[in-house]
Every structure is written in structure tokens, then in C-alpha cells.
UniProtKB/Swiss-Prot annotation:
One cellular-component annotation, GO: plasma membrane
Reactions this protein catalyses: fluoride(in) = fluoride(out)
Annotated source species: Methanococcus aeolicus (strain ATCC BAA-1280 / DSM 17508 / OCM 812 / Nankai-3)
GO molecular function per UniProt: fluoride channel activity; metal ion binding
GO biological process: cellular detoxification of fluoride
Full protein name: Fluoride-specific ion channel FluC
Name of the gene this protein is made from: fluC
Job of this protein: Fluoride-specific ion channel. Important for reducing fluoride concentration in the cell, thus reducing its toxicity.
Protein residues bound to Na(+): G72, T75
Reported regulation of activity: Na(+) is not transported, but it plays an essential structural role and its presence is essential for fluoride channel function.
Keywords associated with the record: Cell membrane, Ion channel, Ion transport, Membrane, Metal-binding, Sodium, Transmembrane, Transmembrane helix, Transport
Cellular localization per UniProt: Cell membrane
Superkingdom to which the source organism belongs: Archaea
Pfam (any one): CRCB
Main location: membrane
Length: 123
């Protein structure tokens, strides 16, 4: 029960932040920029926390709060999928491919950046 409350608190904060970021960042070049930004932020945080936990002790409760709760609500693959599918439905083939590429590559890069920053700061 304690774990569910911890996840819920993180999820509450992550969901609100996602709503705010998605609402204030308009689409650029026909690409859903808000979703892209929250996915980059979430990927960085996951990379940072997961690699930090290899150097310092991060309690399971904090990992649940940050990764499962906060990042789980902040980032969203379902919204990314819907928005990407909408681009292909509207025959926006270049935007469709661009959206997939920048989201996947951007998030992989942010995992790496989070890892590097974590290992640099904590050593």
C-alpha cells in the first residue's frame, strides 16, 4: 500500500507537469513539441537516476517515486503513438518520419546524457 501511495504522489506531480509543459509549448513545424519535450526530460531523469543508483544508494521508494510515478506520468508513449499516427493519417509522411526519429533518438541521447552527468557528478 505504501508503494502505491508513493507512485501516486510522483504520478500526480508528473501528470501536472506534463499538462503544463504540453499546454505552453506549441507545436513546431507540425510536430507535437510538448510531447517531445516531456519525453526528453523524462528520459534524462530516468538515465540520471538509474545510473546514479549504481554509484550511490537510492532507496527503492525514491526510485518508485521518481521513475515509476513521476516519469511514468510525465512521459507518454501512448500520446506519442497517437500523435504520430495522426500525422500519417493526414498524409504528413515527412513529419511522421521526423517525429519518430527525433523522439527515439532524442530520448536515447538523453538517457546517455543523464548517465554521463550522473557518473560525473557522483564520482
Amino acid at each position: 500500500m505504501k508503494e502505491l501511495l508513493i507512485i501516486g504522489i510522483g504520478g500526480f506531480i508528473g501528470a501536472i507537469l506534463r499538462y503544463v509543459i504540453s499546454g505552453i509549448i506549441p507545436a513546431k513545424f507540425g510536430i507535437p513539441t510538448g510531447t517531445f519535450i516531456v519525453n526528453l526530460i523524462g528520459s534524462f531523469i530516468v538515465g540520471f537516476v538509474m545510473y546514479s543508483s549504481t554509484v550511490i544508494d537510492i532507496s527503492p521508494e525514491y526510485r518508485l517515486l521518481i521513475i515509476t510515478g513521476f516519469c511514468g506520468a510525465l512521459t507518454t508513449f501512448s500520446t506519442f503513438s497517437y500523435e504520430t499516427f495522426s500525422l500519417i493519417e493526414n498524409n504528413e509522411h515527412i513529419k511522421f518520419l521526423t517525429n519518430i526519429f527525433i523522439n527515439v533518438m532524442g530520448c536515447l541521447i538523453m538517457i546517455y546524457v543523464g548517465r554521463i552527468m550522473s557518473l560525473t557528478i557522483l564520482r
